[in-house]
Amino acid sequence: MRNILKATTLENKFPLFTVENGCIVSKDADITVAFRVELPELFTVTAAEYEAIHSAWNKAVKVLPDYSIVHKQDWFIKENYAPDIQKDDLSFLSRSFERHFNERPFLNHTCYLFLTKTTKERSRMQSNFSTLCRGFLVPKEIKNKETVTKFLEAVGQFESIMNDSGFITLTRLNSDEITGTRETAGIVEKYFSLSQTDTTTLKDISLGADEMKIGDNILCLHTLSDAEDMPGKVGTDTRYEKLSTDRSDCRLSFASPVGVLLSCNHIYNQYIFIDDHTENLKQFEKMARNMHSLSKYSRTNQINKSWIEEYLNETHSQGLISVRCHCNIMAWSDDRDELKHIKNDVGSQLALMECKPRHNTTDTPTLFWAGIPGNQADFPAEESFYTFIEQALCLFTEETNYKSSLSPFGIKMVDRVTGKPLHIDISDLPMKKGIITNRNKFILGPSGSGKSFFTNHMVRQYYEQNAHVLLVDTGNSYLGLCEMINRKTHGEDGIYFTYTTENPIAFNPFYVEDGVFDIEKKESIKTLILTLWKRDDEAPTRAEEVALSNAVSSYIELITKDSSVTPCFNTFYEYVKTDYREHLQEKNVREKDFDIDNFLNVLEPYYKGGEYDYLLNSDKELDLLHKRFIVFELDNIKDHKILFPITTIIIMEVFISKMRKLKGIRKLILIEEAWKAIASANMADYIKYLYKTVRKYFGEAIVVTQEVEDIISSPIVKESIINNSDCKILLDQRKYLNKFDSIQNLLGLTDKERSQVLSINLANHPGRKYKEVWIGLGGTQSAVYATEVSLEEYYTYTTEETEKMELFALSEKLGGNLELAIKRLAESKRNPEK
């Protein structure tokens, strides 16, 4: 059947002439430079930072010559998550995680910026002179080379100003990225197919009287093209109520409702037209005079005259530049019913900005045509309104979705808005960029906030990326994960130590494999003995410190020279009792300066025959060097004032010796509530030494706590742990809302970070099961992520007693196959009717 509608080819009407040196040249000799724009992540920008971004745009726009066009084009495309399950080395839990998010829909954001130099004549053209309506085009010669050179210099300045702002990155597109190659589509091709994928299909474009179609997609256009449609007041940013509280403020850009918060396929076009400012003002002066002379005939003329005069007064008094502006939201769908919903959604989002929603059907083709990269000068002048640069820039969207880290190492978290999995590196990349100076982490989350879930999720992924993980726990939080690793590796890994009187954890502090005692090792021995000798609240005198230091040094000298002396606590005790006592007498050290009998008496329980003689005289070292996942469970002794701190130090010593021997391998020690055992004044130097050593040997020390009171009341925590942890991780703090000022001061959080922390779990998606977590790096980079996991991971990490019992009972029935038990249990919960 013959097509009765008038048809033509795209080639016939195509408005672009060529692309040279990364510049798009139109058939009317307009020159356009294209950029890819990287915006800050959602919910990570404060009001002051939005002001700074606005100021940078303002400075940049002002360097462009007259008759330039700034066109920012934001693409928001619905996509589905494609899981990466083809890798052979994926673990059972990683594969479960990927499957859980299979086909998860999310909104992908891509942002472009086009800077166009046109002419006075072109900037005044209306829609009836669009290249769409003209029969043929004749390429013009660009006669004035100086104009082009000056424009390109201004573009270079524009790029520098924006990139120097520290918030936005502009990357200039090359010719291949504009026109495409045989393998990948360019931005022009992508525009005509309403897609951002590298492989696109060009579709027929249908321009009807009341609708426009591209392939099967019907376009729905809303425009902001009249000052009357605008709100009475615009700003750089606005308060996002869903994530704000009476004590915190979550900010988004003024135009965010039509950006990432509008969850449908759409393009948000923002145009600023820079005309001749002086000529604009002359026109307005003339218009004001005309209105004045006609004011007797109509009150409207009198009102219009006063509006024009107010605009002129503002221009002269504030030194503002007159420009034209236009914004439009181009949404589409191949389903007419869905399109009705989209139309309502766009209208609602515009109303949130206090703009008057205007559904435009007449100008859709010409506005679509003007949005072609490089064809900005074809914009119909009647669709723009006069304003100032500052106000026009408030209509720019200034944020994007969360991004994955470009790093091979990292952990999988989830975007709190879209639910898309993200790969984030909170250790290596921030270190490389200088955002942090150490990899240590401090985690704070009250009971029930999802803390152990997050730590399980994190250490599991560290382990799978070949890190050595050592955990000190007091609540069986890691039993499921450890047991699973143990069974998977047939006992080679996943070692679970529980402190019992029959099988206590013991070691030898004086044992060094290579026989070399460096300063750090000597310091750790001194700290250990000091902990045994003095109570937490009993600080040693300077004389006592010197005497202890000399005792340790001279004993070490003895054992390195005399191989007949077995290095252990027993021989150290005997040495102090005999040789060192004589040494003190020779030096006339007074008893009040160092009471050696008191020292020996206090340490006697650790000497042979004493109550704790097994603790420091082990004849065998804990052989944990090649075990990659170890858990020490100290729940049985967490209230024991002697055993708890000593055992914790022993474990830390084991970790340090592991660190020294394993070169170039990531090591991680995570201390749960056991940190309280070492948070005494006498331990301060030891903790500082531990943190210093950890950094030196490619390690990470992670301290986890749930009690705010503990950290507020302990100066040692602040000085030794928090100050040496550049990564802070906080979970839901609403429980401590009234105490949050002291937490903020203690952790050194900025107001921006405070707002982010207090937004945790305020607007969780009802259809997804997850808890949110805030991760702050070095006080400069921070965001809130979701810890969402598959059911398989859930049953591995769960700390619920009933769920654990159900899992282990099923595992026993299946002959101890924990992985199969997890699979079966997860499947039964997913499909309960089977």
Regions found by a protein language model. Name each.
Residues 85-90, 127-132, 374-377, 484-489, ...:
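Short secondary-structure boundary/capping segments
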Residues 23-29, 102-107, 317-322, 414-416, ...:
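Short glycine/proline-enriched loop/turn "hinge" motifs that connect secondary-structure elements
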Residues 31, 109-111, 468, 628, ...:
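The start of beta-strands in P-loop NTPase/AAA+ ATPase cores
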Residues 40, 47, 51-63, 263, ...:
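P-loop NTPase motor domains
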Residues 132-160, 353, 445-450, 796-821:
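Short, cationic low-complexity segments
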Residues 100, 514-567, 715-834:
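P-loop NTPase motor core of the ASCE superfamily
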Residues 427-460, 469-478, 495-503, 635-755, ...:
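Conserved P-loop NTPase motor cores
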Residues 1-399:
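Extended, folded cores of ATP/NTP-driven motor/assembly subunits in large transport
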